[in-house]
């Protein structure tokens, strides 16, 4: 489904500010795998997501989706393969447009169809059906401006827009971090439901170690541009935060007393 072969990325190469963001990353995700990704600031998590999505082109290495070479395919051409939800609820939506217009824009972009000024009754009914799954009452507010929605509502809409056409890969970039606990719990539940419903291959970056343990069936720990720990299945299910800290300590040779020290 998704393969990264010897992917490396360096920023400001040859200058005093040189930063090796990714170092020889080799990964393979199978169809339907749900992978959580943890690591401190500067570990390479966001760069990894940007390389997969096409925002960045790696200096070295290759990216494959469904066995197709996409390393040099720009972001807008990967939209048919990839859905993405960002940390900022406003990043995945157009706040000055209505819910209906946002959904229509996402549908047209991913389906490679021209965006029409009018929306047919059939498509409105389809949008309402999808919005019903959120249980937020948004199906009755199609003409509401997205900028007037709460952060949780906007993020739920972003999640829906990223997944309702069943992309090959779903990228979640700390998509609950900016929400209050109640809304974060809601988006987490919706994420689990939609990933399971569509059997989506998912990569989710989080700074919450417990969330990384609770969600998904595989976990990556990143540090200094490398995946230093990869665990899945029953071994992941048995992991605790203390166990993760111990794994980080073994690989870094540094002792940490809390997850904040690792993720900060």
Task: Please identify what each model-predicted range represents.
Residues 206-207:
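H-loop/switch region of ABC-family ATPase nucleotide-binding domains
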Residues 38-40:
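The feature captures the beta-strand-to-loop junction immediately N-terminal to the Walker
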Residues 1, 10-24, 74:
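A short, flexible loop at the N-terminus of ABC-type nucleotide-binding domains that lies
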Residues 61-69, 229-231:
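Conserved ABC transporter NBD signature motif
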Residues 162-163:
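ABC ATPase C-loop
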